[in-house]
């Protein structure tokens, strides 16, 4: 009788990939990145083990959204004080913090809890074309 394979955390090899987000649609990039951060693209995927890879995203400032979402997509945050809600649309967020919209989109697609928090730490987003992870020799991933 064969037994179901269950990956061990010590046996998992985390690879490094780099994605160029120039003129890519936000949601399509985010869904592919979330899938790879979880490790669901691997045959050894195990739900309770972090089997995902490291993802480096460059040129996040050139991400685009479809339709009128650049002005209509609103991100809300609250300070915790009465009347402390603040909102910013996609265009303004990209201008001030390039890549934060992508981080928020991916974070919403990952599981909530200790394992999900460990997965989001493997995502590195940079607004420009330069990144400090060349020593890890990331492979180029085309979407």
UniProtKB/Swiss-Prot annotation:
Keywords noted in UniProt: Ribonucleoprotein, Ribosomal protein
Record flagged with keyword Lipoprotein: no
Gene3D superfamilies (UniProt xref): Ribosomal protein L13
Transmembrane segments: none
Family: Belongs to the universal ribosomal protein uL13 family.
Function text: This protein is one of the early assembly proteins of the 50S ribosomal subunit, although it is not seen to bind rRNA by itself. It is important during the early stages of 50S assembly.
GO molecular function annotations of the record: mRNA binding; structural constituent of ribosome
GO biological process terms held by the UniProt record: negative regulation of translation; translation
Native source species: Albidiferax ferrireducens (strain ATCC BAA-621 / DSM 15236 / T118) (Rhodoferax ferrireducens)
One Gene Ontology cellular component annotation held by this UniProt entry: cytosolic large ribosomal subunit
Pfam family, one: Ribosomal_L13
Entry annotated with the keyword Ribosomal protein: yes
Domain of life: Bacteria
Complex and partners: Part of the 50S ribosomal subunit.
Name of the featured protein: Large ribosomal subunit protein uL13
């Amino acid at each position: 009788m064969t037994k179901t394979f269950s990956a061990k955390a010590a046996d998992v090899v985390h690879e490094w990939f780099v994605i160029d987000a120039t003129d890519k649609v936000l949601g399509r990039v985010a869904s592919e990145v979330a899938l790879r951060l979880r490790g669901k693209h691997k045959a050894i995927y195990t739900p309770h083990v972090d089997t995902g890879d490291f993802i480096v995203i460059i040129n996040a400032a050139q991400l685009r959204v479809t339709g009128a979402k650049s002005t209509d997509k609103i991100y809300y945050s609250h300070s915790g004080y009465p009347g402390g809600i603040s909102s910013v649309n996609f265009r303004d967020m990209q201008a001030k913090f390039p890549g934060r919209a992508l981080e928020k989109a991916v974070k919403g697609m990952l599981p909530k809890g200790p394992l999900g928090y460990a997965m989001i730490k493997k995502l590195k987003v940079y607004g420009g074309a330069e990144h400090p992870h060349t020593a890890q020799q990331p492979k180029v991933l085309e979407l």
